[in-house]
Amino acid sequence: MWYYNNEEYKDTPEEYQGFVYEITELSTGKKYIGKKNFWRPKTLPKNSRRSRRVKTRVESDWREYYGSNVALQRLVEEHGSDGYKRVILHLCKTKGEMSYMEAKLQFMFDVLLSDEYYNEFIGCKIHSRHISKLKENF
């Protein structure tokens, strides 16, 4: 179960690409900050009605997702998901916005220096044009 603004979140909003999240292990308080897409690309094959392949998008596995950190995934598999709280911190309209907000929070909370986080690396490549909508509100 995901939470957003202290309420259970079940929507898959068309207008958002994805979100930045925090997963907390309830017994230890240890956390993980990451990002996840609501959608994944899918290419439909040619058929009798289509002479070309069509690119579309389908819902991703975000509802069951517990981060990309291997140690965290293993703990969830071994002990079950009930011991973890998943919170959406920011809904994002673009992939660039997701990458920016994820990196911003990871640096803000020193996730690589702190033993309070599962994060093991920060990877991002963001151009200012990818976050132009964020710049307008800055």
Predicted regions and their residues:
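Structure-specific nucleic-acid interaction/processing domains
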Residues: 1-138
